[in-house]
From Swiss-Prot:
Keyword vocabulary terms for this entry: Cell membrane, Lipoprotein, Membrane, Palmitate, Signal
Presence of the UniProt keyword Signal in the record: yes
Lipid-binding residues (covalent, S-diacylglycerol cysteine): C22
Signal peptide positions on this chain: 1-21
Coiled coil: none
Listed name of the protein: Putative lipoprotein MlpA
Membrane topology: Lipid-anchor
Subcellular location: Cell membrane
Lipidated positions per record (N-palmitoyl cysteine): C22
CC terms in the record's Gene Ontology section: plasma membrane
Organism superkingdom: Bacteria
Annotated source species: Myxococcus xanthus
Length: 236
């Protein structure tokens, strides 16, 4: 059983995807994942970038980016899988004739039932990568994502709309490690705005019970995406 990850469209926008309330002891659901071509993902650095010789280097993962997230279930075995497709890879895939969409997407095994505190664990992810051809101003490069210990929060209060995990990111020969904090839907924001709808507040489209902050896409900019403010699950 296969699905075309690149062309998969968001088809599930049910009333349960934006739940409110503060009773976090509601009955658990199965391992639900909000499938979408765009989640907002924040990367918190754990280990600074180093090259193959262990020397410090400067290339890092994005501060925040969009990521495609999809769940697949084998109808014959019932086994579930989770697919992660970072925008950094997808945006460069068009110019890469040496890899396929399968190479550019990380696929791992996913629990079928929540375990501890409403989390569904996903592991055994294959690395995802693209090869960037050399240009007049830059050498050839391989950008590589390696995900581990991914945990989707699937409790009934907010089923499948937040996840966390670990990332090892390599680009330009620099490798660094991060903890991920991700939320759906992706809400654009502007730290310079006083309008709640433009700064992760009322009207942003996010679950009003989520504790979120605006993370600019660059260190000097003001525009970016709303991301979880704390550890997952991030609630007020």
């Amino acid at each position: 059983m296969t699905k075309n990850i690149v062309n998969t469209a968001l088809v599930l926008v049910g009333a349960g995807s934006l739940l409110t309330g503060c009773n976090f002891e509601q009955p658990e659901t199965n391992c639900f994942v909000q499938e979408s071509p765009s989640w907002a993902v924040k990367y918190d650095v754990v280990d600074s970038p180093k090259d193959a010789n262990g020397d410090e280097c400067t290339t890092t993962a994005p501060l925040v980016e969009l990521m495609g997230v999809y769940k697949y279930v084998n109808p014959e075995t019932g086994a579930a899988q989770l697919a992660l497709r970072p925008a950094t890879l997808a945006s460069r895939a068009i110019a890469d004739t040496t890899t396929t969409s399968a190479d550019q997407t990380s696929l791992g095994s996913l629990d079928t039932e929540p375990k501890d505190h409403g989390f569904c664990h996903a592991n055994d992810f294959a690395p995802a990568f693209v090869n960037v051809a050399a240009s007049d101003t830059a050498a050839a490069n391989t950008i590589r994502y390696e995900f581990t210990n991914v945990r989707v929060y699937s409790a009934a209060v907010a089923p499948g709309t937040q996840f966390t995990g670990e990332l090892k990111y390599t680009s330009n020969g620099c490798t660094s490690s991060y903890v991920m904090r991700a939320v759906w839907p992706p809400a654009p924001c502007d730290t310079a705005s006083t309008e709640p709808a433009e700064n992760c507040g009322v009207g942003s489209g996010l679950n009003p019970e989520f504790a979120v902050v605006c993370q600019p896409t660059s260190a000097t900019g003001t525009t970016g995406y709303c991301v979880p403010a704390g550890d997952i699950p991030s609630f007020k």
